[in-house]
């Protein structure tokens, strides 16, 4: 009986703690509620988008936190990486990511690209430089180059630009939940806090869908 009471008390304490944490999140402070929600790519699922740039040190530092979190998301949540395209080298790296994603190998080399830029100080600033580096990681060089320069990738680049504009993104890493809520490490208070906020907003959307 004592164990049951203790379990119940712990459960209630946990619930009160979650409620208190939820009360601490304020639209306009930790996150922004977009005035015009952006349609998600998979209707019926809660979409979580991470906007990033391979050259961003904060994005690189965020990887050890967000990767394990994203791999444990429940089936009703769809996680999407989206390159932020602010021109210049941002677009070059963004086109590389979209090419790798189209080839189905982004998961195999995503971390390697980050490390090449931030640890090995490679620029990866041209298609040829990227292709040579990626070939050493098992990516078909000719296929990469042909895909990189394809009309399909150019179309995906335009789509990514429009999404970033719709999300009103000004920096990275930035996260958007279900096309409605935008926030970043600065507004949330750190990497771990960013994912706690993401969890809260995911649950908020899940609860709203049940009403």
Swiss-Prot record:
Disulfide bonds join 56-59. Its main location: periplasm. SUPFAM superfamilies: Thioredoxin-like. It holds the Pfam family DSBA. CDD domains: DsbA_DsbA. It is found in: Periplasm. GO terms for biological process: cellular response to antibiotic. One of its GO terms (molecular function) is protein-disulfide reductase activity. Residues 23-203 form the Thioredoxin domain. Residues 1-22 form the signal peptide. GO terms for cellular component: outer membrane-bounded periplasmic space. Keywords: Disulfide bond, Periplasm, Redox-active center, Signal. Belongs to the thioredoxin family. DsbA subfamily. Involved in disulfide-bond formation. Acts by transferring its disulfide bond to other proteins. This is Thiol:disulfide interchange protein DsbA. It comes from Pseudomonas aeruginosa (strain ATCC 15692 / DSM 22644 / CIP 104116 / JCM 14847 / LMG 12228 / 1C / PRS 101 / PAO1).
């Amino acid at each position: 009986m004592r164990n049951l009471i203790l379990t119940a008390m712990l459960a209630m304490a946990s619930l009160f703690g979650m409620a208190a944490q939820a009360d601490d999140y304020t639209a306009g402070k930790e996150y922004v509620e977009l005035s015009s929600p952006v349609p998600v790519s998979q209707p019926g699922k809660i979409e979580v988008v991470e906007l990033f740039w391979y050259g961003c040190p904060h994005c690189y530092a965020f990887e050890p936190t967000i990767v394990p979190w994203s791999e444990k998301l429940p089936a009703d949540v769809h996680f999407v990486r989206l390159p932020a395209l602010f021109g210049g080298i941002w677009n070059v790296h963004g086109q590389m990511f979209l090419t790798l994603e189209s080839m189905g190998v982004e998961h195999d080399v995503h971390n390697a690209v980050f490390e090449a830029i931030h640890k090995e100080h490679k620029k990866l600033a041209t298609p040829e430089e990227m292709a040579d580096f990626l070939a050493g990681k098992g990516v078909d060089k000719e296929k990469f180059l042909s895909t990189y320069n394809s009309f399909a990738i150019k179309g995906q680049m335009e789509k990514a630009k429009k999404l970033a504009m719709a999300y009103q993104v000004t920096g990275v890493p930035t996260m958007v939940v279900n096309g409605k809520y935008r926030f970043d490490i600065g507004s949330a208070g750190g990497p771990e806090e960013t994912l706690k906020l993401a969890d809260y907003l995911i649950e908020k959307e899940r609860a709203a869908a049940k009403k």
